[in-house]
């Protein structure tokens, strides 16, 4: 479960951002997310510094941070260098100002992140992930992994059976295990 906080008007002080992300950890969320609207480049720096501080204090707790709008675009590209675990981009049309197009994102990621290993998580159930995934595979030439099929193969049962017999918490652990394994793929 993602403990998500958005401020569409401003960027909080560094200490407050860390406090918000730590609250997600304290409430036993799987991931903490903080998104803000920067007014200056210094606001983006504040966000990235808070991200680094949170990762330094709690390296085992994944966080996602981003500054919205055009001014926040660097946080979407370079947030991983400060400890943000995930970034959001778009394959075709941006759904929000500052979203980075896939080609630009991969070009930057290939230059600044060690290796050439990326996992793209796109959309919610019924949002067209399969269609987008096929397009990303075509654009990038990278392997496509259907996460539901992966879980069903490893669990030797359907997702609905997993939910019915084990519950959501078990399914979420299956997702986490899958991401851990996929993260080690060459």
Give the positions of each predicted feature.
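ATP-dependent small-molecule kinase phosphotransfer cores
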Residues: 149-186
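Hydrophobic anchor at the beta1->P-loop junction of P-loop NTPases
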Residues: 121
């Amino acid at each position: 479960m993602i403990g998500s906080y958005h401020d569409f008007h401003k960027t909080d002080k560094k200490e407050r951002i860390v406090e918000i992300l730590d609250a997600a950890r304290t409430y036993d969320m799987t991931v903490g997310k903080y998104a803000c609207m920067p007014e200056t480049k210094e606001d983006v720096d504040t966000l990235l510094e808070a991200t680094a501080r949170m990762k330094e204090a709690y390296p085992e707790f994944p966080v996602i941070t981003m500054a919205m709008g055009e001014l926040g675009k660097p946080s979407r590209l370079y947030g991983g260098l400060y400890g943000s675990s995930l970034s959001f981009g778009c394959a075709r049309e941006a759904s929000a100002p500052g979203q980075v197009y896939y080609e630009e994102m991969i070009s930057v990621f290939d230059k600044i992140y060690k290796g050439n290993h990326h996992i793209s998580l796109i959309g919610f159930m019924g949002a067209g992930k399969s269609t987008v995934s096929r397009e990303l595979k075509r654009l990038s030439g990278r392997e496509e992994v259907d996460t539901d099929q992966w879980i069903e193969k490893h669990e030797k049962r359907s997702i609905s059976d997993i939910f019915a017999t084990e519950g959501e918490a078990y399914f979420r652990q299956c997702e986490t295990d899958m991401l851990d394994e996929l993260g080690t793929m060459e």
